[in-house]
Regions:
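Short glycine/proline-enriched turns and hinge-like loops at secondary-structure junctions
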Residues: 124-125, 143-144, 169-171
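Short secondary-structure subsegments characteristic of cysteine-rich extracellular domains
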Residues: 149-160
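A short hydrophobic beta-strand segment most commonly corresponding to one strand
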Residues: 127-132, 155-157, 171-185
Length: 185
């Protein structure tokens, strides 16, 4: 569902173009075993803490206080302050109560995000929003039985509890900022 348009995304796109190394800093989604994101490059702005624990005791201690919905700022969020202004605008528009994951995903021409459904605990807690930073006709976004083209500067909500996928049949990179926001619904 289209929830906003005419968002000025140019300052963020220029900032990203000045820092191409940010696409290579975190390959977690792309490298996830059997994951749907092998054609995706991501800039992680906010995401849950990804820790490695050397002992069972350390892991158990971490899990005793773990909040699966908590996301933390990653270094690129400070490097791209232009993203923060768009995120805060979106939060105000939708009555956001808590900010979760925020990432910028790029799908090359001919690339895709394979069909998948996000985890129920996540989809029941957060609403998923896309802010379109770059796109072109030929990008097909499907959620359930609905296919949409999302234009530059638009903000969309979609039901990520439904099977969804993206196919980039355009000649340009498809770049979206994805924001998970807890709303009062």
């Amino acid at each position: 569902m289209l929830i906003g348009h005419s968002i000025d995304v140019m300052p963020l796109m220029l900032a990203i173009k000045r820092r191409p190394n940010l696409w290579k800093e975190d390959t977690y989604l792309r490298d996830y075993p059997q994951g749907p994101f092998k054609d995706v490059e991501s800039i992680m702005l906010r995401f849950p803490f990804k820790g490695v624990y050397e002992t069972e005791a350390e892991l158990k201690n971490h899990l005793s206080t773990y909040d699966q919905h908590e996301s933390i700022d990653y270094p690129p969020y400070a490097k791209l302050p232009e993203a923060r202004s768009i995120v805060m605008f979106l939060m105000a528009q939708v009555g956001g109560e808590r900010l979760g994951r925020v990432m910028i995903n790029k799908i090359r021409p001919g690339g895709r995000i394979y069909p998948h459904v996000d985890t129920p605990s996540h989809t029941e807690y957060y609403s998923r929003f896309h802010v379109v930073l770059q796109s072109a006709p030929g990008v097909d976004f499907r959620a359930g039985d609905e296919h949409v083209y999302m234009g530059v500067g638009e903000a969309w909500w979609f039901n990520n509890a439904k099977e969804h996928e993206v196919i980039n049949n355009s000649g340009v990179d498809r770049i979206h900022m994805i924001c998970d926001v807890k709303t009062s619904k």
